[in-house]
Design a protein with these regions (language model features):
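Non-heme di-metal
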Residues: 1-265
Length: 265
């Protein structure tokens, strides 16, 4: 696979995905202004990983949040989700060079948001007395998202799927952190959740551009197998946030009602 030209956004994306130090993952240099012309599709198979990150096939789940270690573990999981999201936005920028410039510019913008979110979570982890790498992580997003063969499938699983579910997860964990008196941790998650709305809206906009007006069944079929709506929602659904992101009440109702036994599935 030929590497992108130097001093291009594509090269920045390439270098970010392949970066193998925490500094380059958490604080990469700003991207150049120039883009490649007529670049080939590049589908990176796996990201670079800093030595501090211990990647496992199945990460230990967070249980209680009463103690600082439990909260740090939860935040560490969220940090790794944001890191993978940033990498996969850069991945898509390289994988789908034929898409409109506005779409690829949006991917770059969201990647930089996600990088900033990793920094927010890193600060919170340090506040609790731990560091990035203190807990094992799983590259689950990387196991699934690159199976998306088309731009429509990519935004179906990222913007309309995983990032939409984060609207619920951020709200739920913010409430749980606040319940045990960790206001700083709660506010960090609320900030990420608010900014996620624009990312979901981006997914809605471009799913409709690449596929069809947002419809639950069309979206469900666009998810790369074996993914289903089951993993693309939290509880309770954040209806107001999803509406602000452009999802209709009908879409939200169907998402909430969906089960693996739903007829037609």
């Amino acid at each position: 696979m030929r590497e992108p030209q130097q001093d291009t956004v594509e090269r920045w994306a390439w270098d970010y995905v392949h970066a193998s130090t925490l500094a380059d993952k958490l604080s990469p240099p700003p991207p150049p202004e120039g883009w490649e012309r007529g670049g080939a599709a590049r589908r990176i198979e796996s990201p670079g990983r800093p030595g501090e990150l211990h990647i496992v096939g199945k990460a230990k789940k967070t249980r209680g949040l009463d103690g600082e270690e439990g909260r740090a573990r939860a935040l560490h999981t969220f940090l790794h989700h944001e890191l993978q999201a940033a990498e996969l936005m850069a991945w898509a920028l390289l994988a789908f060079p034929e898409t409109p410039p506005e779409f690829r510019a949006g991917l770059l913008r969201i990647a930089r948001d996600e990088i900033r979110h990793t920094g927010i979570y890193a600060e919170q982890i340090v506040r609790l007395g731990f560091g990035v790498g203190a807990f094992a992580v799983r590259d689950w997003f990387w196991e699934r998202v690159p199976t998306a063969k088309t731009p429509a499938s990519f935004v179906a699983v990222m913007g309309l799927g995983l990032e939409s579910a984060n609207l619920e997860h951020a709200a739920s964990f913010a409430a749980r952190f606040r319940q045990v008196g960790d206001e700083d941790g709660a506010r960090a998650q609320e900030l990420v959740g608010r900014e996620e709305i624009a990312h979901v809206r981006f997914g809605v906009t471009w799913f409709e551009a690449f596929a069809a007006p947002l419809d639950f069944e069309i979206w469900r079929r666009a998810l790369p197998e074996p993914l289903t709506p089951l993993l693309m929602r939290g509880h309770p659904l954040q209806r107001d946030a999803r509406r602000k992101a452009g999802q209709s009440d009908r879409f939200i109702d169907e998402l909430e009602a969906w089960t693996p036994d739903t007829p037609g599935c």
